[in-house]
Amino acid sequence: MASRSALTLSALRERIARPPRAWRNRIWAHRARLGGKPDVAEAMPEPVFLGDAGRGEELVAGSWRALGQSVAVGRASIWTAPIPDPRLEAERQACLWLDDLAALGNAAARVLAQAWVQDWIQRYGSGAGPGWEA
C-alpha cells in the first residue's frame, strides 16, 4: 500500500499535468482562432424555432418587435437601435429575429441578416459584451 504522501504527490502530479478547464477552453479558443476558416459548413443545423415572415417584413421595413414592444431600427443596424427596456437586450442578443428574416426568405431579408450578423461580429466578436454574459 502506498503512503499518504505518495498518493498526495501522485494526485498533485496529475493535477499539474492536466490544465484547469478555464485554461483548456482558452487554449482551444486560441487554436480555433489560428486555424483556417472552413469554406462551407459541413452540416447545417435544423432551426430550433420557426420564424415569422410577417415579423421578417417588419424588420426589413425598419421595426423590430419583441416582448410586446416595438423598437424603431430604421435603416441602421439592430445593434445601434436604442433599447427602451433592459430586458430587450437579451432578446436582441438571442438573435431570434434572424429566424424571422430566414422565414421571409427574400433578398432584402438575406442582405439585412448578413449585415446585422457582420455588425455583431465587429462589435462583440472578441468575446466581450452583452451577448457573452450569462
What does each model-found stretch correspond to?
Residues 79-82:
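Large, well-folded core regions of big proteins
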Residues 1-74:
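Extreme N-terminal leader/anchor segments
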Residues 85-134:
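Aromatic-lined, polymer-binding surfaces characteristic
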